[in-house]
Amino acid sequence: MKNKFTHFLMAGALVCWSSYTLHAQTEVTDTYLKNPSFESSFTDWDNAGLQTQTNTSFSKKDGNTYVEQWVGQGNKVADAHVSQTLTSLKNGVYKLTVAAQNIQQNSSATQSGAYVFADNEQVSVGAINDYSLTFTVIEGQA
């Protein structure tokens, strides 16, 4: 395995809308998500095995910082995660959008094993892109 990068940026959008026929979306990132672009390192995040980085190799970052796990050629990427428990959410349907990538340097091969998750939902991460998923809050937490 060559160098492998996994970059996550939680600064996309967290929106909420009503489940009624008339759908109204409201941007709620700043209301519920703390330190969404990791500008304060891992403050407010549960981190296991990831590091912050400030170089320019992740073009979708918002601000100066992003999160990555990088390993040298011939090494395997270890299990890692970064998460945040959101509380006091209003009941409803939410959409989480995250800028992320899961790549092996100098290879166009599709990589696996990286996910964006919220509550019981997840979406697989591959090439650099915005990844979205929806989840439902019933008891105020995700």
Language model feature labels by segment:
Residues A24-K34:
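Boundary/junction segments of secreted and surface-exposed precursor proteins
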Residues F117-A142:
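Extracellular carbohydrate recognition and processing domains
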Residues Q69-W70, H81-T85, F117-A118, N129-S132:
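Short structured motifs
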Residues F38, A80-S108, L133:
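Extra-cytoplasmic beta-strand recognition segments
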Residues S108-A114:
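Short coil-to-beta strand junction motifs in C2/discoidin
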Residues M1-T26:
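Bacterial Sec-dependent N-terminal signal peptides
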